[in-house]
Amino acid sequence: RCEKEAVNSDCPVCSAEDADLSACKGTEQAMSLMAAAADDGTISGDVTWENQTITTPVRLTGDTTITLKGENTITISDTAEVSALEMDYRSLTIQGSGSLTVTVPNRKYGIADSAYSDTVGGKLTIKDGAKITTNGGQYGLSAKTIVIESGTLNLNSGYGIDTASLTMNGGTLYATGNYGAISNSYGKARNIDSNLTILYSESQNAKTDDMSVGTAADTTREGDVKTIYIAKMAPRASLIVGA
């Protein structure tokens, strides 16, 4: 922690000219704040976002874990970058008690490894109750491998998700899009916990009461199924598989 008589020259906050030392809360917070708003728009390693408002694309330069606190947003306009949060073949874990809302224009991606293929690509993991919302663009989430351990995901884009492999062990997923709920680029691997209920609809923005109970196979029906909802639910007599 920096004080008037002892300023850490390596502290990215307090070493600045005329810095407010009373705001110093230690190197850990200073480094997190620096990483959250890096001048070149890059992040790597362990990063904490707390009530961040980001308006330029962010790109990973190494495997990264983002811990969310409070309400965080990334909103980008039509830029040269493809994704609001670009994984660039890296692995990304998003965790924490906070939320992240990503809003992008047409043809752009939300949280994505935009150039993944059948041979290379990173893994996107959501856990610890993180709340993820995506709005607009081509894909909400796009990665070769997506793992949802827990959390609440509300994805509304051209496709809510684009992936070759989706694993879901807990949490709540609502994915919808005008093209489809889930796109199966380079594969249709699914591993969805048997304790979770899968609902589907051939309509975009469908309400759960209007959806039918399905199976993992329905999450691969790329062009037909426009909305997918997966969560732990109590059985309802009105829901019939394949109805």
Describe every region a protein language model picked out.
Residues 1-31:
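Thrombospondin type-1
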Residues 13, 25-243:
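A composition-driven surface/loop motif
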